[in-house]
């Protein structure tokens, strides 16, 4: 009988949030988009980690910080199979089930360079639409609709 040693590839946290099963190559973008680094707390990032589910994954751990259900659901746009776990005393005390939000405000940038959201002091605002497995976002201001990946890569 063969034995295997399993060890954590990213250090455990005592208290905070773990966002696991993020698609590989998306972790840094999520940190930036959702301003997850706007904290003095320690953040641990694992990129291209092995995953039984998808081959490779990214992982984010934020100590002493807890995502609201609304914040977690906004992550579902780009990491629909991600898990968001609340950790207390090194144990998972709550698992958030992600679902697409109806709208995303003050996070994304409209890809339309003529949109007023670029030049006016307004927060971006998108309505989320899901049809036949495709996710699109409609800008509140210019009313143009974009594939969610187009918006993800807009800066």
From Swiss-Prot:
<keyword id="KW-0479">Metal-binding</keyword>
<dbReference type="GO" id="GO:0046872">
    <property type="term" value="F:metal ion binding"/>
</dbReference>
<dbReference type="InterPro" id="IPR020542">
    <property type="entry name" value="Asp_carbamoyltrfase_reg_C"/>
</dbReference>
<keyword id="KW-0665">Pyrimidine biosynthesis</keyword>
<dbReference type="GO" id="GO:0006221">
    <property type="term" value="P:pyrimidine nucleotide biosynthetic process"/>
</dbReference>
<dbReference type="InterPro" id="IPR020545">
    <property type="entry name" value="Asp_carbamoyltransf_reg_N"/>
</dbReference>
<feature type="binding site">
    <location>
        <position position="142"/>
    </location>
    <ligand>
        <name>Zn(2+)</name>
    </ligand>
</feature>
<feature type="binding site">
    <location>
        <position position="110"/>
    </location>
    <ligand>
        <name>Zn(2+)</name>
    </ligand>
</feature>
<feature type="binding site">
    <location>
        <position position="115"/>
    </location>
    <ligand>
        <name>Zn(2+)</name>
    </ligand>
</feature>
<dbReference type="GO" id="GO:0006207">
    <property type="term" value="P:'de novo' pyrimidine nucleobase biosynthetic process"/>
</dbReference>
<comment type="similarity">
    <text>Belongs to the PyrI family.</text>
</comment>
<dbReference type="InterPro" id="IPR036793">
    <property type="entry name" value="Asp_carbatrfase_reg_N_sf"/>
</dbReference>
<dbReference type="Pfam" id="PF02748">
    <property type="entry name" value="PyrI_C"/>
</dbReference>
<comment type="function">
    <text>Involved in allosteric regulation of aspartate carbamoyltransferase.</text>
</comment>
<dbReference type="GO" id="GO:0009347">
    <property type="term" value="C:aspartate carbamoyltransferase complex"/>
</dbReference>
<keyword id="KW-0862">Zinc</keyword>
<comment type="subunit">
    <text>Contains catalytic and regulatory chains.</text>
</comment>
<dbReference type="InterPro" id="IPR036792">
    <property type="entry name" value="Asp_carbatrfase_reg_C_sf"/>
</dbReference>
<feature type="binding site">
    <location>
        <position position="139"/>
    </location>
    <ligand>
        <name>Zn(2+)</name>
    </ligand>
</feature>
<dbReference type="Pfam" id="PF01948">
    <property type="entry name" value="PyrI"/>
</dbReference>
<dbReference type="InterPro" id="IPR002801">
    <property type="entry name" value="Asp_carbamoylTrfase_reg"/>
</dbReference>
<protein>
    <recommendedName>
        <fullName>Aspartate carbamoyltransferase regulatory chain</fullName>
    </recommendedName>
</protein>
